[in-house]
Amino acid sequence: MIMKKALAVVVFGGALFAAGAAFAARQKPALPDFAHWTATELKGYEGPLREKVAGEHRTSSVKLADYGSSNVAISHREANGIPEVHAHMDDYFVVESGEASLVVGGDVVNPKLVEPNETRGDSIKGGEKKRLVAGDVVHIPTGMPHQLLVEKGKRFTYFVIKVKAK
């Protein structure tokens, strides 16, 4: 009789443990601020972005996430960008497709503060030109002038990460 009660307690306890473990597995908190964009997902943005290209600079972008201290977007260009300088943000580009030249360094010609911490200009004097193609990754530190140049008839799609500098 004691063996039957002990066996019943073990079986009941095991069942309770298994049910509790299953419940806990379902109750795991989501990974806050975790994001994963697959290569296929990112490629899927190119067509819709090309359809939305507008303005003199023939660009379009979609912000994918904003985490406060950083944000992520995917952008598409079919013409030259505007020279710019970010006072408090580092830029990282991951080239998805196409090709462009990135002018970095030097001085912005006719700089204008267009919004707090953001300067734009007419061109960059004395910068270095770097050719970018699919798979390339660049880091543009805070305060560094930069401009993307896209040859007529070419396209350029890139994943952008902006991080507040310390």
Residue ranges and their predicted role:
Residues 1-10:
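Bacterial N-terminal signal peptides that target proteins for export
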Residues 87-106, 115-123:
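Short, conserved beta-strand element in jelly-roll/cupin
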Residues 153-166:
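A short hydrophobic beta-strand segment most commonly corresponding to one strand
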Residues 20-85:
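A short, N-terminal "cap"/entry segment at the start of jelly-roll beta-barrel domains
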Residues 84, 91-94, 129-130, 137-138:
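His/acidic/aromatic-lined binding-pocket segments of jelly-roll/cupin-type domains
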Residues 131-152:
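Conserved metal-binding segment of the jelly-roll/cupin
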Residues 9-19:
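Bacterial N-terminal signal peptides
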Residues 111-133:
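An anionic, turn-rich surface loop/hairpin at beta-sheet edges
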